[in-house]
């Protein structure tokens, strides 16, 4: 009986099969190759890397602008005519696309690490192009329609850059294992120099990046100013329907500094609270009076307005994803809210909070078009509300307002020079948080001008503004910000310097050690395993060298792995005698030479 010993045994290599299979659909051993990656596939790798960076930026953008999700929804509502929570599906889609691209990039880097030829599958290429094109189009659209929001990205980096730097240093340190492997395998000195110079240029640029980082929270703790005062934006709109008595009462329960309200004049001259031009979003006007749904809210009389429900929309659309957290009693109360008049707000807030009042101009055909400011002033003055607790925002007829109500805090909603503000007797500024810098805050403070910033909902943004010395902010999320005891982080400059210098030194030491280790492991390797010989006909050696190496491997395995004594005892009269009684040669007599050739060809297959 003849027992055959296989000339070569291959381990399953499941991890390698999964690596090449998922990336390029090359699940079989014979489909893999150690050849150099083609220029075309290198171009796809560069495109993959670029797409990774772009989708990472896009994902970071949508994660950080959650402070302004409501603003984005409001913008699209005005464009499309219906309310929906658009940022959530955008964020989920972006996260899924980023995860897919990141997975492909990890697989590509693993190909480089193990010396496998990259061959991205055509389905992945289609997905890559689709994601890249979609991201570019989306970013361009946001840049045109919501261009101010890109400034939020720069502001957020003031809070995250110190920690992103440490994370980037750690990532580059881990990536150095692959770069060092390429450096060690490179046979040409010019290639090694190029790899070394390029990599360490990037590394040292990253090490010195903290010199360009500026954050208001890098400061001594003793220099931290008081916590910014909180003004409820339309009350507490995350806990109750905006501009309702319930919303303002919830805000007062938090002991806020002030309340912000938008005032509209009804057709019969009653000031009431409404932000939108129409009633469609925040009332049930489409159910009660469909013919009035698109009419301006100020073109309805107060009797009609009182018949509308101003709370059901909050429970139905759940604009801040907070309706489910309401208690049963709050849920019932919210469901039965009606439109709030200015007189009701003044009575509720009297002696309890400062009011930041903004007036919305009525249409030209409105009977109170020319006198709506006087009507509003009379309502405030007749209520007995303290004048010094009113921040008056409208710029129209400001001299008249100062004459009639000299105690009002005149507030400007536009950014102007200090001299112009002083001439207009402006005491406060009400600006978007992206409109003012730290230096401008200090300049305004030196002229005794207080600055209020809107709309601040995210704790990270509130912390940054706290460190920057902002006196007050307007917020939808006042119930959460009122519970923030201190900035999310604050670090003395010396400690921050020590942190990034230590991170850089540790990283540099590890990188040098990795390069030395990889050079020691891979620098002198010039041998080949059977798989390399079979699947790669031109790796470092000429085809003649590969043929010679095949023969050496085959005969070395014959001498080491074949049980010669058993074969001789069982098959003494066949062609195996040639191998047992003569030296192995690539080409021999009839018996041995032909069989050797057969074995070589079998091995080659």
UniProtKB/Swiss-Prot annotation:
Residues 64-89, 147-160, 214-496 are extracellular. InterPro entries: GP_PDE_dom, PLC-like_Pdiesterase_TIM-brl. The keyword Transmembrane helix applies. Pfam families: GDPD, GDPD_2. It is found in: Endomembrane system; Cytoplasm, Perinuclear region; Cell projection, Growth cone. It catalyses: a 1,2-diacyl-sn-glycero-3-phospho-(1D-myo-inositol-4,5-bisphosphate) + H2O = 1D-myo-inositol 1,4,5-trisphosphate + a 1,2-diacyl-sn-glycerol + H(+); sn-glycerol 3-phosphocholine + H2O = sn-glycerol 3-phosphate + choline + H(+). Residues 582-605 are annotated as: Disordered. GO terms for molecular function: glycerophosphocholine phosphodiesterase activity; glycerophosphodiester phosphodiesterase activity; phosphatidylinositol-4,5-bisphosphate phospholipase C activity. Its EC number is 3.1.4.2, 3.1.4.11. Disulfide bonds join 15-18, 25-571. It is a multi-pass membrane protein. Residues 1-42, 111-125, 182-192, 518-605 are cytoplasmic. One of its GO terms (cellular component) is growth cone. PROSITE patterns: GP_PDE. Intramolecular disulfide bond between Cys-25 and Cys-571 is reduced by PRDX1. Residues 228-485 form the GP-PDE domain. Keywords: Cell projection, Cytoplasm, Disulfide bond, Glycoprotein, Hydrolase, Lipid metabolism, Membrane, Neurogenesis, Transmembrane, Transmembrane helix. Glycans are attached at residues 301, 336, 352, 374, 448. GO terms for biological process: lipid metabolic process; nervous system development; positive regulation of neuron differentiation. Interacts with PRDX1; forms a mixed-disulfide with PRDX1, leading to disrupt intramolecular disulfide bond between Cys-25 and Cys-571. Belongs to the glycerophosphoryl diester phosphodiesterase family. Glycerophosphodiester phosphodiesterase that promotes neurite formation and drives spinal motor neuron differentiation. Mediates the cleavage of glycosylphosphatidylinositol (GPI) anchor of target proteins: removes the GPI-anchor of RECK, leading to release RECK from the plasma membrane. May contribute to the osmotic regulation of cellular glycerophosphocholine. This is Glycerophosphodiester phosphodiesterase domain-containing protein 5. It comes from Homo sapiens.
């Amino acid at each position: 009986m003849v027992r055959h010993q296989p000339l070569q045994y291959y381990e399953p290599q499941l991890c390698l099969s999964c690596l090449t299979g998922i990336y390029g659909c090359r699940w079989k051993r014979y489909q893999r190759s150690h050849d150099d990656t083609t220029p075309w596939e290198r171009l796809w790798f560069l495109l993959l890397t670029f797409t990774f960076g772009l989708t990472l930026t896009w994902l970071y953008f949508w994660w950080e602008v959650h402070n302004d999700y409501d603003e984005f929804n409001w913008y699209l509502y005005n464009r499309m005519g219906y309310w929906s929570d658009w940022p959530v599906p955008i964020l989920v889609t972006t996260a899924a696309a980023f995860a897919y691209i990141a997975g492909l990039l990890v697989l590509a880097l693993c190909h480089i690490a193990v010396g496998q030829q990259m061959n991205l599958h055509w389905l992945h290429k289609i997905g890559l192009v689709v994601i890249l094109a979609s991201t570019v189009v989306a970013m361009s659209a946001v840049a045109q329609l919501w261009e101010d929001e890109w400034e939020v990205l720069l502001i957020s980096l003031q809070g995250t850059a110190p920690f992103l730097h440490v994370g980037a240093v750690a990532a580059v340190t881990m990536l150095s294992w692959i770069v060092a492997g390429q450096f060690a395998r490179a046979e040409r000195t010019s290639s090694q120099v190029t790899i070394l110079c390029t990599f360490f240029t990037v590394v040292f640029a990253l090490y010195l990046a903290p010199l360009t980082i500026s954050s208001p929270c890098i400061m001594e703790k003793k220099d931290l100013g008081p916590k910014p005062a909180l003004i409820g934006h339309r009350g507490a709109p995350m806990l109750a329907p905006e501009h309702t008595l319930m919303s303002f009462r919830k805000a007062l329960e938090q002991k806020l500094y002030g309340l912000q309200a938008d005032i509209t004049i009804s057709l019969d001259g009653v000031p009431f609270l409404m932000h939108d031009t129409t009633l469609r979003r925040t009332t049930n006007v489409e159910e009660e009076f469909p013919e009035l749904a698109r009419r301006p809210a100020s073109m309805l009389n107060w009797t009609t307005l009182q018949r509308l429900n101003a709370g059901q929309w909050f429970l139905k659309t759940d604009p801040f994803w907070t309706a489910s957290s309401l208690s049963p009693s709050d849920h019932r109360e919210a469901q039965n809210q009606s439109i709030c008049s200015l007189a009701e707000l003044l009575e509720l807030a009297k002696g309890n909070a400062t009011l930041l009042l903004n007036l919305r101009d009525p249409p030209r055909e409105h009977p109170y078009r020319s006198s709506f400011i006087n009507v509003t002033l009379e309502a405030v003055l007749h209520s007995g509300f303290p004048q010094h607790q009113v921040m008056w925002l409208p710029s129209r007829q400001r001299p008249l307002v100062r004459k009639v109500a000299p105690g009002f805090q005149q507030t400007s909603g536009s950014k102007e020079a200090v001299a112009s503000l002083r001439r207009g007797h402006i005491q406060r500024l009400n600006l978007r948080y992206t409109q003012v810098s730290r230096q401008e805050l200090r300049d305004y403070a030196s002229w005794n001008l207080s600055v209020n910033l809107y709309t601040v909902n995210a704790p990270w943004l509130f912390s940054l503004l706290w460190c920057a010395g902002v006196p007050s902010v307007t917020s939808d999320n006042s119930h959460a910000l009122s519970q923030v005891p201190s900035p999310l982080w604050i670090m003395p400059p010396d400690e921050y310097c020590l942190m990034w210098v230590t991170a850089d030194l540790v990283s540099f030491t590890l990188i040098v050690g990795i390069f030395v280790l990889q050079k020691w492991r891979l620098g002198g390797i010039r041998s080949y395993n059977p798989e390399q010989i079979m699947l790669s006909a031109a790796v470092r050696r000429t085809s003649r060298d590969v043929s010679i190496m095949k023969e050496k491997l085959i005969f070395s395995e014959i001498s080491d792995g074949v049980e010669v004594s058993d074969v001789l005892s069982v098959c003494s009269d066949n062609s195996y005698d040639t191998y047992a009684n003569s030296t192995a040669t690539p080409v021999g007599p009839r018996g041995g030479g032909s069989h050797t050739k057969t074995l070589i060809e079998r091995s080659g297959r």
